[in-house]
């Protein structure tokens, strides 16, 4: 295809290395599959592991290194691939922490995404003392100005309109900004932010490093890459298609965190009809729940990133062979557990980000396997569950009494 696409692009004005159907061809093959081998600052590594990451995702294995090396990078990736942490880690690695000036700018299409990015940056940069301000419409402009004037945050993340406004009024100084990230570029352009994005580019240093992330590559995105990026590294990460079709999703209103354990014990008989995976949000909690279940004489296995690979392999083998029936684990292994016979998943904790929901309970579409997912929901979780329903355009119903018949 590559020869043809080059001819097509010459005639139609697209950049080299693009398919006419808007899929980029990767031109970077270096893969680093371990955070420890990326030469990151010690304080940043601590933040990465404390956040719960164990192994870099496909995009992180490919894109962090060229970003850190200062290349312009175009990454074609959907949400749920770990793209936010990719550029968050790259920015944090390049920060000069002692220097109290804004050194990186991130644009996102919506306030919600901007705030989500800010959260990830602050969490990963926690041990470094990195500061990050979210510049978003719908908040008080005067407060924003005072904040930006009082102390320049290391990183500003925001929506194009508000960021342009702050640059224009000179409350946000472009002088020391060395890295500019456009997240969900296709979304931003389809929402009509093109002029503001171009105007922001005009205000930034011409030597700035540009990192652009986009799920699709329509012409208006390609135009940005041609106009503002120099010899970009191109990275394409295909997302596995996961589906919730055929999965019956239920919730149990446990009301309070401390009532989850009894609820789980009541369900144990049901779990062992088949094989079940129970997801929790932290490794510490996995250990805690495993101990509690053992103390009550329930047989369960646990799996998380603190264990060495040998130990994990043994546990996975036992689980795959069916000799262990209930597995307690964290999100990071959600992507790695493809156990054909798991037909029941319990979210003891709802996932902290909604993309992980489909990684926990979704199935590869081509197998079309049936399954049941049960979500433990406290009062505080109700909003998160609604958010998940909206995001996936799905419904999660209250668990019926005869759930055993459905498994």
UniProtKB/Swiss-Prot annotation:
Gene Ontology molecular function: ATP binding; ATP hydrolysis activity; helicase activity; RNA binding; RNA helicase activity; translation initiation factor activity
One GO CC term, this protein: eukaryotic translation initiation factor 4F complex
Keyword Phosphoprotein appears in the UniProt entry: yes
Binding site for ATP: 77-84
Gene Ontology BP term (one): cellular response to leukemia inhibitory factor
EC number from the UniProt entry: 3.6.4.13
Residues the record lists as Phosphothreonine modifications: 159
Span list, region Disordered: 1-22
Effect of residue 364 to E: In NEDHSS; likely pathogenic; dominant loss-of-function variant unable to fully rescue lethality in eif4a2-null Drosophila
Keyword vocabulary terms for this entry: ATP-binding, Disease variant, Helicase, Host-virus interaction, Hydrolase, Initiation factor, Intellectual disability, Nucleotide-binding, Phosphoprotein, Protein biosynthesis, RNA-binding
Motif (DEAD box): 183-186
Annotated ranges, domain Helicase C-terminal: 246-407
Pfam families noted in UniProt: DEAD (PF00270), Helicase_C (PF00271)
Phenotypic consequence of residue 181 to L: In a breast cancer sample; somatic mutation
Catalytic activity: ATP + H2O = ADP + phosphate + H(+)
Residue span(s) of domain Helicase ATP-binding: 64-235
Keyword RNA-binding: yes
Motif (Q motif): 33-61
Disease: Neurodevelopmental disorder with hypotonia and speech delay, with or without seizures: A disorder characterized by global developmental delay, intellectual disability, poor or absent speech, hypotonia, epilepsy, and structural brain anomalies. Inheritance is autosomal dominant or autosomal recessive.
Similarity section: Belongs to the DEAD box helicase family. eIF4A subfamily.
Summary of the function given for this chain in its UniProt record: ATP-dependent RNA helicase which is a subunit of the eIF4F complex involved in cap recognition and is required for mRNA binding to ribosome. In the current model of translation initiation, eIF4A unwinds RNA secondary structures in the 5'-UTR of mRNAs which is necessary to allow efficient binding of the small ribosomal subunit, and subsequent scanning for the initiator codon.
Subunit architecture: eIF4F is a multi-subunit complex, the composition of which varies with external and internal environmental conditions. It is composed of at least EIF4A, EIF4E and EIF4G1/EIFFG3. Interacts with EIF4E. May interact with NOM1.
Protein name from the UniProt record: Eukaryotic initiation factor 4A-II
The organism of origin for this protein: Homo sapiens
